[in-house]
Amino acid sequence: MKILIVVDMQHDFIDGVLGTPEAVAIVPKVKEKIEQYRDDPNGVVIYTADTHHENYLNTMEGKKLPIPHCIHPSHGWMIPEDLYILNSPIIMKNTFGAENLPNYLTSIERICEKDKGSIEAIEIIGLCTDICVISNVMIAKSCYPEVPIIVDSSCCAGVTPESHKNALEAMKMCQIEIV
């Protein structure tokens, strides 16, 4: 099976309080990639969602980035309908990396192995390349060192174009396949 992890494609990161023109620009390609996996009999799509609460400004992240965002269950927290496949798992996380991502991947592998085989590849796309994407890529690589981990750079955007490029280079150095 091939797994697509869609990282934090939420309103606040696309066109909300932390949105950027680059984030808006990748939406059509992200949608196309999600549809490819949805239509592939061996494809599985899972999502992460940055998830904060009213106390966000009191957290370590909130003190360093004092912009409330992805407050559950606000509009900004939501994944746009046209990017979400109904009934697909959403891993809610309150920090950059989804600490329970390994458990989700193991569960998906157990549930789907009979029909779709073992994990052949994990592709990771979304926002922001230089924060949450790279964090989740490293978690996946640590858990599945022998499985190809792929990042489609055209389906990612960073806080800035320069930080996006730097994150892609850092992932390349960690044997991540950048396409």
Q: Where are the model-predicted features located?
A:
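Active-site acidic carboxylates
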Residues: 1-91, 110-111, 117, 146, ...
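Short glycine-rich anion-binding loops that position phosphate/pyrophosphate groups of nucleotides
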Residues: 12, 51-52, 96, 128-130
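Short, well-ordered secondary-structure micro-motifs
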Residues: 57-59, 101-104, 135-136, 162-163
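Alpha-helical scaffold elements lining the catalytic groove of polysaccharide deacetylases
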Residues: 92-116
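Short, small-residue-enriched loops and turns at beta-alpha junctions
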Residues: 98-99, 156-160
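Glycine-rich anion-binding loop/nest that anchors nucleotide
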Residues: 119-132, 150-156
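Short Gly/Thr/Asp-enriched flexible loops that form oxyanion-binding sites at enzyme active sites
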Residues: 133-142
